[in-house]
């Protein structure tokens, strides 16, 4: 991110101390980035949150849909029009689209599968014939807090 002109807002890293002795826990990196950055366009499978500026919802959806992957997406809004646009055929092109819930993996109980380069579950699984349909798991949270999977908390 830094090499392409972005800023690291929160430096991630290995968690240490009581409860983290195994060395298998990390804190996320939060970075200001632009959609054309090479790292943004690649599926890193790392705890990195990219913050990108936009003016209109259509611009944000276009940035999201411009990456080659399409597993999971999320929007945080209480605006019903924005929610409907994001969940519509004109919105997220991911296999999983969430409203007011992050892309934590808790949505795996739905009709799971990615799109574009993240489509292995649909193309090789028992639902392979359904790849010719556009399905999407939608989760909408009307609460005042954002639930995270497995009790995860981001206390910075």
Give each language-model segment a name.
Residues 2-7:
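Basic phosphate/pyrophosphate-binding loop/patch that engages nucleotide-derived ligands
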Residues 9-12, 75-76:
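Short beta-strand segments
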Residues 12-19, 102:
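Short, solvent-exposed loop/turn elements at beta->coil junctions and helix N-caps
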Residues 21-156:
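Conserved C-terminal structural/oligomerization subdomain of aldehyde/semialdehyde dehydrogenase
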């Amino acid at each position: 991110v830094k090499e392409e002109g972005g800023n690291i807002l929160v430096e991630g890293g290995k968690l240490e101390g009581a409860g983290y002795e195994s060395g298998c826990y990390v804190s996320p990196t939060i970075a200001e980035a632009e959609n054309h950055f090479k790292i943004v366009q690649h599926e890193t499978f790392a705890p990195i949150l990219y913050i990108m500026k936009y003016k209109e919802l259509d611009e944000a959806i276009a940035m999201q849909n411009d990456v080659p992957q399409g597993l999971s997406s999320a929007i945080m809004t209480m605006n019903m029009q924005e929610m409907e646009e994001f969940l519509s055929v004109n919105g997220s092109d991911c296999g999983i689209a969430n409203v007011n819930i992050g892309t934590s993996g808790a949505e795996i109980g739905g009709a799971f599968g990615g799109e574009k380069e993240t489509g292995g579950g649909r193309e090789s699984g028992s639902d392979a014939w359904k790849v010719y349909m556009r399905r999407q798991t939608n989760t909408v949270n009307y609460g005042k807090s954002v639930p995270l999977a497995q009790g995860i908390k981001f206390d910075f």
